Regions:
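Core nucleic-acid recognition elements
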Residues: 10, 33-170, 182-188
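A structural-propensity feature for long, helix-poor, extended segments
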Residues: 38-48, 52, 254-293, 486-496, ...
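A glycine-rich phosphate-binding loop feature that marks nucleotide/adenosyl-phosphate handling sites
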Residues: 41-42, 60-63, 78-84, 190, ...
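Core structural elements
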Residues: 50, 65, 137-152, 191-205, ...
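Active-site cavity-forming subdomains of large catalytic enzyme subunits
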Residues: 85, 91-132, 214-501, 507-509, ...
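Catalytic alpha/beta core of large soluble enzyme barrels
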Residues: 118-126, 130-144, 430-431, 524, ...
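Conserved oxyanion/phosphate-binding beta-strand-loop segments in alpha/beta enzyme cores
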Residues: 128-148, 176-209, 236, 712-721
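Internal maturation/activation junctions in enzymes
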Residues: 201, 517-539, 543, 565-661, ...
Length: 750
């Protein structure tokens, strides 16, 4: 008699019927898969004392190897087999235990925040959980969930199952609601049905003691050593807790600039970016991956040429930053000079700092004044040659990322409180930031403290007038002896965004959008108050603007299932209709929340407060891409909504942004964000090897509508982006797919 060794170490007689039970369940109700084929091809070599783990892994691998374009459903077979294995690993039996047992175990392991379960009726929520929703997972989706999101004990073993995880996240995000039990169920339904998925930090950390839920941060560095090193500290803290970072360096003086009256003293921005690069490597994200930091400068900065060389493999290594993502913050004037084949002037920001504070016509006017000023040091370059260098690097390395300053700021709903200086790592978040401001702090021997601006004129007791930054402890003021002079910081603004994405493959009708969007907006708004903030400046900024970023994913799958060709007119019309509905319902939901919980503190004076919406920033060329009946027509009652917002306010200063969704789209088994598929079949590298993946719901009916990205006219991607952008107050992470034959010098010269 053959025996089998269970996970517990216990030995029992081998029972083939138990194996058949699991294999039968794994193929149930799936087309074009075969139980006999699975069992025969597994070729399990039964022997005495074979382990159940070995049997299970053999079956899983057999199913995975069968995934192909003509039989995509094998991914669900593999997922079910993996889940059966996971149930046993977590619970010791096939299925779910009680929600209370899950919480007790998680608290004991120190992985679930104490007290959360005490705020709810666990018996009620346990009965609400629908374990059948596990059947939605593809194999790569459930593997991603297991490897990246499920809580583990100190040995690295999973201690939660998917539906418990989704319910715990929902409970965490609903805990401050007056009727938290009901809202937990609504949040759970959205997440567990794969209708809306929060971003990775929320999935990973909501329910845990270290509940850092935000995806990305955006900051700015001032032009002084205190501010530069405070930026290093801030970036380190943000990276430590898993945030992606976008950071503006445009204010830092160029190489060869003056410092304290000394010529050629400044080393420029590059040495500081080298330190930033080392921070990204040294301060990894909770040990899971290296930090991810995008660094931005404007194209008039004198260090622009060296900046574009940051990722080159040749040259002086001390001036290379292979782990950073260089990004350009481009103004319209630069693009006009390229079109005109004109000259472009480079400045040291120490001489022209207000260029960072201006955009549009005001920037153009000031920039041209500096060009004409003979007292301002400057360098000249042909705009087209600089642009050619940008594109050469772009084609060779994928960087610099390109973002457009004037467009971002013209659409900024909160331009009354500042300026957008850069975007984030993934170039979809556009919010106001402000570098720290430093003042001179004079501490007297009697304990009195006085603050001065650095260039403020101060008259000492001996009658000498000095700049405040030149005051020392040898001076006396008003008969008082100075103990020490140091710099004090007035913190600026570091923007933060909390993201979630609507799965368009499941939510694409007016009825579903109207149902789903208000729940998603409330869920994201709750993230703001429940978040762990790594830095006080980040929390203060987020509470002032209450920024969220509701986006979409699964666009390509939705189009394929509805037999709509990518980039055709029907595509533009469909996405225009959907994005309008999302925009309308998101704005309405935020206004309703404002009525219930209060408007964001910076609402007064915003474009929202004046009834100005994202659609009002759309240009006529974009509007003409889709015929809405005349030049432009409405599907929703926008005028009524404008009046409502002016009257009731907005809960969130920033509302919509389309993120890349690289991990969460895999988790829910749909196509990434707004992008076409790269291929109809490809392989994803995983810890367990290469996993075959096919486009979602691939069939003879959808095959022709899954056009690979590299086969498309890339202008179609830009047109689709323009249609979406009409309805978005922030931005969208948009990729362009270029093959090597289209990135040659010939095309650059053309």
């Amino acid at each position: 008699m053959l025996t089998v060794i269970k996970r517990s170490g216990r030995t029992e007689p081998l029972d083939i019927s138990k194996i058949k039970k699991y294999t039968s369940e794994s193929v149930k109700d799936l087309d074009n898969v075969s139980l006999s084929e699975l069992e025969v091809d597994a070729k399990i070599q039964f022997r005495d004392q074979i382990t159940t783990t070995e049997i299970q892994q053999t079956l899983i691998k057999t199913a995975v190897d069968k995934i192909d374009v003509d039989r995509p459903n094998w991914t669900f077979v593999a997922a079910r087999l993996f889940l059966y294995d996971l149930y046993h690993r977590v619970n010791g039996f096939s299925g779910y235990g009680h929600l209370r047992d899950y919480f007790n175990r998680g608290e004991k392991e120190g992985r679930i925040v104490l007290g959360l379960k005490d705020k709810y009726d666990l018996d009620d929520l346990n009965s609400y959980i629908d374990v059948r929703r596990d059947l939605q997972f593809t194999y790569l989706g459930v593997k991603t969930l297991h490897d990246r999101y499920l809580l583990k004990n100190r040995k690295g073993e999973p201690i939660e199952l998917p539906q418990h995880m989704f319910m715990a996240i929902a409970m965490f995000l609903a805990q401050n609601e007056l009727n938290s039990q009901d809202w937990a169920k609504k949040f759970y339904d959205l997440i567990s049905k794969f209708e809306v998925m929060p971003a990775t930090p929320t999935l990973s950390n909501a329910r845990t003691p270290r509940h850092q839920l935000s995806s990305c941060y955006i900051g700015s560095t001032p032009d002084n050593i205190e501010g530069i090193f405070d930026s290093f500290k801030e970036m380190s803290l943000l990276s430590k807790y898993g945030g992606g970072i976008g950071w503006d360096w445009s204010l830092v003086r160029a190489m060869g600039g003056m410092i304290d009256g000394h010529k050629n003293a400044a080393g420029g921005v590059i040495p500081f970016l080298k330190i930033t690069n080392d921070i990204a490597v040294a301060v990894d994200q909770l040990g899971t991956r290296k930090g991810a930091i995008a660094v931005y400068i404007e194209p008039w900065h004198m260090d622009i040429s060296d900046f574009l060389d940051l990722k080159k493999n040749s040259g002086e290594e001390r001036r290379r930053t292979h782990e950073l993502f260089p990004s350009l913050w481009i103004n319209d004037l630069f693009m006009k000079r390229i079109e005109q084949d004109a000259m472009w002037t480079l400045f040291d920001p120490a001489d022209t700092p207000d260029l960072c504070e201006l955009y549009g016509e005001e920037f153009d006017k000031r920039y041209e004044e500096y060009e004409k000023n003979p007292n301002i040091p400057k360098e000249f370059v042909k705009a087209k040659e600089l642009w050619k260098k940008v594109l050469t690097n772009y084609f060779e390395s994928g960087s610099p990322f390109l973002c457009f300053k004037d467009n971002a700021n013209r659409a900024n709903p909160n331009n009354h409180t500042g300026i957008i200086r850069s975007s984030n790592l993934c170039t979809e978040i556009f919010q106001n930031t402000q570098p720290n401001h430093y003042v001179i702090k004079v501490v007297f021997n009697n304990g009195e403290v006085r603050l001065f601006e650095e260039d403020e004129d101060i008259k000492t007791d001996d009658g000498i007038v000095k700049k405040a930054k030149k005051i020392t402890a040898l001076d006396t003021l008003d008969g008082k002896t100075i103990f020490i002079v140091e710099k004090d910081v007035k913190e600026g603004k570091t923007a933060v965004c909390n993201l979630a994405s609507i799965n368009l493959s499941k939510v694409n009708t007016q009825e579903d959008i109207k149902r789903v969007v208000p729940i998603a907006v409330r869920m994201l708004d709750n993230v703001i108050d429940l978040n762990f903030y790594p830095h006080s400046k980040v929390k203060r900024t987020n509470l002032l603007s209450r920024s969220i970023g509701l986006g979409v994913m699964g666009e390509a799958q939705m189009l394929a299932e509805q037999s709509i060709a990518w980039g055709g007119y029907d595509h533009l019309a469909k996405i225009d209709e959907i994005m309008e509905a999302i925009s309308y319902n998101a704005i309405k939901a935020s206004s309703n929340l404002s009525l219930e919980k209060g408007a964001y503190p910076e609402f007064e004076g915003s474009k929202w407060s004046k009834g100005i919406f994202p659609i009002d920033a759309a240009n006529e060329n974009t509007k003409r891409l889709v015929d809405r009946g005349g030049l432009f027509g409405y599907t929703h009652d926008w005028e009524k909504l404008r009046e409502k917002v002016k009257k009731d306010g907005m809960r969130n200063g920033y509302l919509m942004a389309i993120a890349p969704t690289s991990s969460i789209s895999i988790l829910v088994g749909t196509t990434q964000t707004i992008e076409p598929v790269y291929k109809r079949k490809w392989f994803e590298e995983n810890l367990s090897g290469m996993i075959p993946v096919t486009a979602p719901k691939l069939s003879p009916d959808t095959w022709g509508f899954y056009t690979p990205a590299y086969e498309l006219d890339q202008k179609l991607l830009i047109q689709a982006g323009a249609v979406r952008q009409k309805w978005i107050d922030q931005g969208q992470s948009l990729n362009i797919f270029i093959t090597l034959d289209k990135a040659s010098g010939k095309y650059l010269n053309d």
